[in-house]
Amino acid sequence: MPAGPGSSLILVVEGEWRARQSLVGEFQLAGWDILQAATGEDAIARIRDVGDWMEIVFTDIELPGRLNGWDVADAARALYPELPIIYVSSRATEVLRQVPDSHFFRKPCKASDILAACVRFQRLGYGRPERRSVH
């Protein structure tokens, strides 16, 4: 699957329904294909179901359920080490954890900034299935 809006798949993991729907709407308007998850458990299941077609994972750090956004990222990276992750959190201390091939936003943040980070990852070739190692 080639990279580019309209053919790029992003997983949006956000526990707050309104925030998730707002972001999903922005991504869809920009031409992205979207998968959604409200919990870490659901996100990990979707990552496993889709396989390496996913190009980017966007996750809130604070999620309902047992697993948080760090757990989602760890599971995604265990399967696809080069998969870009975009993190968001309302806690300033979360930014202290540096993760390669990732970007951190502090809430509140603009959807346009998140979209711009996704486009930067694409332009650099991150997240493209053909770039990843087979596991």
Regions found by a protein language model. Give the residues of each.
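Non-catalytic signal-transmission and effector/linker regions of two-component phosphorelay proteins
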Residues: 1-24, 48, 52-53, 82, ...
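Conserved sequence signature across two-component system core domains
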Residues: 13-14, 37, 57
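Short hydrophobic/Thr-rich beta-strand motif most characteristic of the beta2 strand and flanking loop
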Residues: 31-41, 46
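Acidic catalytic/metal-coordinating carboxylates
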Residues: 39, 67-72
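Active-site residues of response regulator receiver
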Residues: 60-61
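Short amphipathic alpha-helix used as the core "switch/output" element in two-component signaling
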Residues: 70-82
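Hydrophobic/aromatic residues positioned on beta-strands within the core alpha/beta folds
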Residues: 88-89
